[in-house]
Amino acid sequence: DFFTGMFDTSLGEGQIVTGVRFPVPERADYQKFVQPASRFALVGVFVAKYADGVRVAVTGASESGVFRWSEAEAALSANFSADAVPAAPGPEGMIGDIHGSPDYRAHLIAVMTKRAVAAAA
């Protein structure tokens, strides 16, 4: 709800963030596939396992910024294993540029999610 798009938030004029709270997950890991020249994430995935389920956040891939991959969250909530990660999400809405096509970025999301789950397990 806070991020409304790429480099855009819901903060109004004159507002500032004074605090942020995150629940501590039972297990978590962040994996990124870096763009060599900039070292920014071509795709980054954060996986966090909580008592009530799993959260999967994706960065660097979408035209609208950070998003949660709900299909992976559902699959990993049932079975927290790299083998449970679904096939790559569709390329719709993914960034396409000289560093990677939307299809490539979608594929990387699944790969980085599997790596994050394996590292957190």
Please provide the spans of the model-predicted regions:
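C-terminal structural segment of proteins
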Residues: D1-A121
